């Protein structure tokens, strides 16, 4: 099992267990300060950005997509998973062009000294697991945008995108990009009324210690809701926060309750392993071919949940759903 995949699954499952997440609280919207500066309100206070930044470090797992979508090419990007060139996935690579940003990682925490050496004028660290001490150290280097509430990783994609749009003085452009994603998924739902109310499961592409991990209804499944689907209620008893961890003895019943099952696999080997798992192999869902298995790029696009990756999902997932639901 690849180390990067392990880190991806750990973060998402740990969030489900409440290890990396706290209760969300209402968050004020970013605003403008005097003299044309922008003020971003976040978990650790407020950050004032006096002018459009030119040397931006993307210090979290997914912020590069939001920056690149606005034409802001970061001087450093943080690797998450997937072994992509410069930690930028195919949907964002055209926006990167010939740039060659420094690639950071969070394997041992944020690389503060390396970031300082890059002399940034903005650090975007919304999906970086910041604590107060690390925030203070980064803020001593350059204005730093942190997560907006207690979720150390993976706050709602629209909140992250909106804050980044504000931080680079392109709030209106970001709003247009977000609205376009919403329209794209809503249009798919309107064109496929037969999908309305059908039950779906969005599952990790690998088992977690013999269990199936599925995504609870929430912002991560909004794109499915916009297309008319609903997350099957059968996962609720096994859910905590963002993720449901379904024990071996319950896998068959949970899977059988869904009309379509989307497994975010990254390889044919992962597909085969998932189908061979006890409970999955025995399910009617498997016998009746209700499974969709993603490619590596499709799994990445769902995981990144960004204004650049979601259009890939909207283009490539519906034909697969249509094979099952009509």
Please identify what each model-predicted range represents:
Residues 23-32:
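Bacterial lipoprotein signal-peptidase II cleavage site
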Residues 254-326:
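Structured C-terminal subdomain patch of bacterial secreted/periplasmic proteins
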Residues 46, 133-207, 303-326:
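Extracytoplasmic substrate-binding proteins
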Residues 55-70, 173-234:
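Basic- and aromatic-lined ligand-binding clefts that recognize polyanionic substrates
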Residues 119-125, 143, 257:
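Proline-aspartate-enriched helix->loop->beta-strand connector
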Residues 1-5, 9, 13-22:
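N-terminal secretory signal peptides
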Residues 63-114:
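A short, structured surface patch at a secondary-structure boundary
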Residues 31-68, 81-83, 318-325:
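Extracytoplasmic low-complexity, Pro/Thr/Ser/Ala/Gly-rich segments
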